[in-house]
Amino acid sequence: MNKTDRRSFLGKGAAVAAAGVAVAVPAVAQAPKKVVHWDGGKPPDKTPLFSGAVSYGNLLFLSGIGAHFEGDIKAHTKHVLDEIKTKLESCGSSMDKVLKCNVYLADLKDYKAMNEVFLGSFGSEPPVRTTVSVAGVPGNSLVEIDVIAYI
């Protein structure tokens, strides 16, 4: 290989290497980060036990939401789904963007009535769902639901 060919080869190699770095740098610069979506837009004065909503990249995780008032399973389920909808929208998502849903029932006998309210709440393509009956839901709620959605 003569001097001219080597220079041409080395010049092309340097250009390819520079292009590779240029492509890799934006990927590193745009790495996802954890964002806590605080109620009211600012962190509380004291460190809370848990966060109500956290996003990572375009994934959004909502902690379990219950209903803490007297009522039947239908009223509790409707309230919880309304709260989920409000929280999703405040974080830039929506019910039809929910990917995964966990439902915790205080009593399995409420399964059918909960489903009557739940049906259609997430649009025509509902998320995957797991439903379990648990020994107790905090705050005497008959149902608690948490979701994972995308933004």
Please tell me what each predicted stretch does.
Residues I84:
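Residue-level signal for inorganic ion chemistry
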Residues N2-K78, E89, A106-I151:
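N-terminal presequence-like segments and the immediate start of the first folded domain
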Residues V98-D107:
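Acidic helix-start/capping segments at beta-turn-to-alpha-helix junctions
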Residues D96-V98, R129:
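Short secondary-structure junction motifs
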Residues K87-D96:
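Phosphate/pyrophosphate-binding loops at sites that engage ATP/ADP/AMP, CoA/4′-phosphopantetheine
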